């Protein structure tokens, strides 16, 4: 990879997007295995696999919050670093990198303390029952210790990708994923540790990835380097980053809030089997979202660099290509889920009743997944050009204005109240995608006209 980032403004957009997105997509697919391999193994533990899977599923909202805090800093910091580099200001970009690194360590310490102190109370509030609470506590107590590894791996890897080192970003994920896949069966079955073994395998794998990421950013191959002189949390540097990252934080942390609401409603109407099915649905949706995230993240350095350089034509061309690729993927995945839902369910459980229940719920829950590429493309474009307010608006409308109330409203309109809870997802998505499309058409057009006007002013 070139040390000079000007290639982001000169190489053909299609070739460049493919070169940056493919490694990231591969990394996200591998990362999907990293995230769900625990659940696959746990769901097949002899005797109590279904309850253990449900217990670990209750931990997912907390795991989402941990990941969301990594994005809170890096999802805004990485694009701002790219924009600074597009302007030729690598010094400011390195200050952003160093400040975000320190901020994530502080956040990790706070989260770890809170999770270890309030683990049982949080898990009960998040939908654990008397049958599943012990499995959830066993998993979370160990996972919480590795919070700092999650924060630094996810957060700092975003800065690696933002510099155009997509291959290095892919290796980061693959190191952790392969380690987890190898260690899981050893700890779960070989050492008979059950869910505790799954959690231990996960944090060891995250530690290995963390060492790789930090070593790279301290090394000589990176464009932006971690330097001790930049390890201070300056409001002037951090506040713009977390403002821009707030939309991604809301998107990811709201998944946790939504998961809690889903779990509580499903426990009320359908019992443990409905919550267990939700664990599988969440895993399948991660499968759907992670490659889309990978494609979007591959486009971010191109969009941000060219926006910073004032090249509106390349920004528009990159977005159109991003939208086409995301929609194509969304349609293909939607078709597979609707045609073969039981195949996805069998990946996570051997319980026939849970498989049948999940297959029916999956078709409802993913009914409009085919259109979600629009949402992801517009969201990334807003973030890449530094449009924090629009990014936040899109995130808030979909999750809090629409989905959250619909979880409680939809059961009142259908006879099968459990399936009514699942129906909230597609109904919210249709409305949210419509809103996002309208907002994007207006605001992105304004941003491009402003960029073109600035460019004309500079050439006079």
Model-derived segments and their meaning:
Residues 1-24, 81-148, 192-245, 303-368, ...:
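Short alpha-helical transmembrane segments in multi-pass integral membrane proteins
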Residues 25-79, 143-150, 239-306, 326-334, ...:
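Transmembrane helix-bundle signature of multi-pass secondary active exporters and lipid flippases
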Residues 31, 35, 39, 43, ...:
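Juxtamembrane/transmembrane-helix interface segments of polytopic membrane transporters
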Residues 74, 143-161, 169-177, 198-211, ...:
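Short runs within selected transmembrane alpha-helices of multi-pass transporters and secretion channels
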Residues 53-113, 150-169, 277-335, 339-341, ...:
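Small-residue-rich hydrophobic transmembrane alpha-helices
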Residues 33-36, 44, 50, 84-87, ...:
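Helix-loop interface residues and adjacent transmembrane-helix termini in multi-pass membrane transporters
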Residues 19-20, 58, 181, 243, ...:
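Hydrophobic alpha-helical transmembrane segments of integral membrane proteins
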Residues 36-40, 113, 155-159, 178-186, ...:
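Alpha-helical transmembrane segments of multipass membrane proteins
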């Amino acid at each position: 990879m070139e040390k000079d980032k000007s290639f982001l403004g000169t190489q053909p957009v299609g070739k460049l997007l493919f070169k940056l997105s493919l490694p990231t997509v591969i990394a996200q697919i591998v990362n999907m295995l990293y995230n769900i391999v625990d659940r696959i193994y746990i769901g097949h533990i002899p005797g109590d696999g279904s309850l253990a899977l449900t217990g670990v599923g209750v931990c997912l909202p907390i795991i989402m919050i941990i990941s969301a805090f990594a994005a809170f800093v890096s999802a805004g910091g990485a694009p701002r670093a790219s924009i600074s580099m597009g302007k030729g200001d690598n010094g400011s970009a390195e200050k952003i990198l160093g400040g975000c690194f320190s901020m994530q360590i502080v956040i990790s310490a706070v989260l770890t303390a809170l999770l270890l102190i309030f683990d049982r109370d949080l898990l009960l509030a998040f939908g654990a029952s008397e049958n599943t609470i012990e499995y959830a506590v066993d998993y979370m107590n160990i996972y919480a210790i590795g919070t700092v590894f999650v924060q630094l791996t996810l957060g700092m890897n975003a800065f690696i990708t933002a510099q155009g080192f997509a291959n290095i970003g892919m290796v980061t994920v693959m190191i952790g994923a392969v380690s987890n896949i190898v260690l899981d069966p050893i700890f779960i079955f070989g050492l008979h540790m059950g869910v505790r073994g799954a959690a231990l395998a996960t944090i060891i794998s995250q530690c290995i990835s963390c060492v790789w990421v930090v070593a790279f950013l301290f090394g000589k191959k990176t464009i932006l380097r971690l330097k001790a002189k930049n390890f201070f949390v300056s409001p002037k540097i951090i506040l713009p980053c977390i403002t821009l990252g707030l939309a991604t934080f809301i998107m990811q942390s709201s998944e946790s809030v939504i998961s809690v609401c889903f779990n509580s409603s499903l426990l009320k109407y359908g019992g443990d089997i409905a919550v267990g099915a939700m664990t599988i649905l969440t895993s399948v949706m991660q499968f759907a979202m992670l490659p889309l995230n990978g494609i979007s993240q591959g486009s971010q350095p191109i969009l941000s660099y060219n926006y910073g350089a004032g090249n509106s034509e390349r920004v528009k061309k990159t977005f159109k290509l991003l939208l086409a690729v995301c929609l194509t993927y969304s349609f293909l995945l939607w078709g597979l889920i609707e045609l073969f839902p039981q195949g996805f369910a069998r990946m996570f459980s051997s319980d026939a009743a849970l498989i049948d229940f999940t297959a029916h719920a999956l078709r409802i829950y993913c009914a409009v997944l085919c259109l979600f590429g629009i949402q992801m493309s517009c969201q990334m474009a807003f973030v890449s050009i530094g449009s924090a307010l629009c990014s936040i608006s899109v995130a808030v409308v979909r999750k809090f204005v629409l989905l959250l109330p619909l979880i409680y409203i939809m059961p009142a309109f259908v006879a099968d109240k459990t399936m009514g809870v699942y129906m909230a997802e597609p109904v919210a998505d249709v409305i949210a995608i419509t809103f996002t499309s309208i907002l994007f058409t207006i605001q992105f057009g304004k941003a491009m006209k402003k960029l073109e006007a600035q460019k004309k002013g500079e050439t006079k």
